[in-house]
Regions:
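Catalytic nucleophile loop
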Residues: 1-8
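Amide-donor transfer/coupling interface in amidating biosynthetic enzymes
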Residues: 9-155
Length: 155
């Protein structure tokens, strides 16, 4: 969520962009999920558990998982506000993972970055020492590749 807010403020120029969880704003790029808006007693009403996500073919996330259909665990009430999706995508932040039932954005990537993936879900919830999240493995691999490239260039 913070990556989306930062991008909105400093790339899209929406200086007051924020999450409606933090403050009321003219640009709630992260907003309360529609099904949560009528709920006044919030206890026990979060989006909890595993939900499906369809990854875009050719995305870094799809490459990391090695498949297009995944299921990851959630714990939240706030989501990317799809009213801003066209602006984000035109500026280079792509929604590359979407819930097929609700059209909620689950995964974002920066198109011209060696490895920038943001998720709405919590990949750490299903990750273990013996079976780490594919995103964690992909991130470490990308960092190692980057370090190796830098070492070769600086010799």
């Amino acid at each position: 969520q913070c990556a989306v807010i930062e991008f909105a403020r400093h790339v899209l120029g929406l200086a007051d962009a924020n999450s409606s969880e933090m403050e009321q704003t003219a640009h709630p790029v992260i907003d309360l999920m529609e099904e949560q808006k009528g709920i006044t007693a919030k206890g026990g009403t979060m989006r909890l558990g595993a939900y499906p996500c369809v990854l875009h073919k050719g995305s870094k996330a799809a490459e990391a998982y090695g498949k297009l259909h995944i299921s990851e665990r959630h714990r939240h009430r706030y989501e990317f506000n799809n009213d801003y999706l066209a602006q984000f995508e035109a500026a280079g932040m792509k929604a590359v993972g979407v819930n097929p039932d609700t059209n909620l954005v689950e995964v974002i990537e920066l198109e011209n970055h060696p490895w920038f993936i943001g998720t709405q879900y919590h990949p750490e919830y299903k990750s273990t020492m013996l079976s780490p999240s594919p995103l964690f493995v992909s991130f470490v691999r990308a960092a190692l590749d980057y370090a190796e490239k830098e070492q070769k260039q600086n010799k």
